[in-house]
Amino acid sequence: MTSIAGGHGEANPNSSWLSARGFWLAYLLGLLSVHLLFLSVPFVSIPWAWTATNLLHNAAHLYFLHVIKGAPWLSTENDPSRRWTHWEQIDDGVQMTTTRKFLTAVPIVLFLLTCLYTRNNTEHFIPNFISLVVVTLPKLPQFHGVRLFNINKY
């Protein structure tokens, strides 16, 4: 009898845990708690708290979904998904699933809320817009498996 990583029968749990029950709620509550943490800092204004929340969220999104490759539970030598980012492994690579749509919509909605609360101030708009573009482009189906400028090729 062989033991499968994760103990629940899936060869690569990386592909399905984001679709698990309660993940979306936990994700949004975590995002809200980070924002409230920024708001609780005495010298941070509301626009800066929104900008910091947006930039931190997008940086974490970019790193955890589009930079890290492979699955932590599998051997790196024999794992066929070792060259895929976490985003490319979600739902076994199937495009436009509800999980992928949710993870694409959250940065966009957060950007729109940030624009609303910063009143489209150029000082806040430019970094927020750049981070939105950087975190949204890799999510498009046309970029599945594409490594721009050979970044993150290996």
From Swiss-Prot:
GO cellular component labels: cytosol; endoplasmic reticulum membrane; serine palmitoyltransferase complex
Query: How is this protein situated with respect to the membrane?
Result: Multi-pass membrane protein
- The entry annotates sugar attachment on 14, 120
Q: Quick check: keyword Glycoprotein in the entry?
A: yes
Q: Which InterPro entries match?
A: ORMDL
The record's Pfam families line, in alphabetical order, gives:
ORMDL
Compartments it resides in:
Endoplasmic reticulum membrane
What's any GO biological process attached to this entry? intracellular sphingolipid homeostasis
Q: In which tissues is it expressed?
A: Ubiquitously and homogeneously expressed in the syncytial blastoderm and during the cellularization stage. In stages 11-12, it is expressed in the germ-band layer In later stages (stage 14), it is mainly detected in the ectodermal tissues. In imaginal disks of third-instar larvae, it is uniformly and homogeneously expressed in eye-antenna, leg, wing and haltere imaginal disks, which is consistent with the former ectodermal expression detected in latestage embryos.
Give the chief site where it resides.
endoplasmic reticulum
Q: Does the keyword Membrane apply?
A: yes
Keywords attached to this Swiss-Prot or TrEMBL record, sorted alphabetically, are: Endoplasmic reticulum, Glycoprotein, Membrane, Transmembrane, Transmembrane helix
List residues traversing the bilayer. Answer: 23-43, 102-118
Q: What does this protein do?
A: Negative regulator of sphingolipid synthesis.
Q: Which family does it belong to?
A: Belongs to the ORM family.
Q: What is this protein called?
A: ORM1-like protein
The record lists the lineage as: Eukaryota, Metazoa, Ecdysozoa, Arthropoda, Hexapoda
